[in-house]
A protein has these predicted regions:
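Beta-sandwich/jelly-roll carbohydrate-recognition scaffolds of carbohydrate-active enzymes
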Residues: 1-240, 273
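Aromatic-rich carbohydrate-recognition surfaces in CAZymes
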Residues: 241-298
Length: 298
């Protein structure tokens, strides 16, 4: 996929593309100072907590805890990442939000209730509201910085493996072209005739949305988090996640059976695998956890 975002108020142009298990972002800056900020702080789920560690001047690795949605269960699971920037930064380091202190303690801390930057700290840092920054002091007009990110639900090592396998040192433009070609192949499995251009756009937009979830959760080596336990399993097929089955059994999965049978087959094998992991078929599964969100059974 490819998304070209408009310029920000600071004049920064952002472009984003992806592979099944990695992402690539390209930032075009105006002349002067620029920053790449990794935010591992509070999210939209019922869990917080993260860790980030410096690997080199242009690479960090770490993890973030996630929870389920709608606050239905107290499940927690990690997502691991490896992040690289294409240009050597002027300065770099972790940051952390310092909670507001009470009484005389607040007068002792210059970072009270603000974000503290760690200039000369190069080991791991952990907490609820943390991140990492790459700062550039001398960017030329139109200079670009590319960010490469690999993720895994199993380990940092697998996140790095996914990044190496799926990006292989390719440029943003190469990855964008590959993503565009893949989406054209996927959407091109259905050819429509007639209708207005707007109606055709609506149709292919809906088909695009239908292919977003369920999404791949297994790594390039076949490893994945087992249902509920989170232990590492290994499959000889592509393992999927995000099964909103009460919504999708009526129409999405029949569509996949007709048009994308190889994906539907792997999804069915995934559901059987979840039963083997857990002893139950899922109702509304999210990243290896049962959310129990919807009534009844699919």
């Amino acid at each position: 996929d490819y998304a070209h975002l408009c310029k920000t108020a600071q004049g920064i142009t952002t472009e984003v593309t992806a592979t099944p298990r990695t992402s690539c972002e390209r930032y075009t800056f105006p002349a002067g100072e620029g920053h790449i900020i990794l935010n591992l702080g509070q999210g939209l789920t019922n869990e917080s907590g993260a860790m980030v560690r410096r690997v080199s001047s242009t690479e960090v690795e770490g993890m973030k805890l996630l929870g389920t949605f709608c606050y239905t269960t107290q499940a927690v699971f990690p997502i691991y990442f490896v992040m690289r920037v294409s240009r050597e930064p002027s300065t770099a380091g972790p940051w952390k939000f310092q909670p507001k202190l009470q009484g005389v303690e607040s007068a002792w801390s210059p970072d009270d209730g603000t974000y503290k930057l760690y200039e000369n700290y190069h080991r791991e840092i952990a907490g609820d509201d943390i991140g990492y920054r790459f700062s550039y002091d001398d960017l030329g007009e139109g200079e670009q910085v590319t960010v490469h990110m690999g993720v895994s639900f199993v380990s940092i090592e697998n996140a790095r493996m996914n990044l190496e396998a799926e990006q292989q040192g390719k440029t943003f433009d190469q990855l964008r072209a590959e993503a565009t070609a893949q989406w054209n192949r996927d959407l091109g499995r259905i050819r429509i005739e007639g209708g207005t251009p707007d109606q055709q756009t609506i149709f292919y937009t809906a088909l695009y949305h239908a292919l977003i979830h369920p999404s791949i959760i297994s790594d390039v080596n076949g490893e994945y988090p087992k249902m509920e336990s989170g232990d590492t399993g290994k499959a000889d097929y592509t393992r999927y996640s995000v099964f909103s089955l009460w919504d999708t059994y009526r129409n999405l999965h029949p569509l996949l059976t007709l048009v994308y049978p190889e994906r539907q087959t792997d999804m069915l094998r995934t559901l059987v695998g979840m039963y083997e992991d857990w002893g139950w078929l899922p109702r509304w599964e999210l990243f290896g956890r049962e959310t129990y969100t919807m009534e009844g059974d699919p």
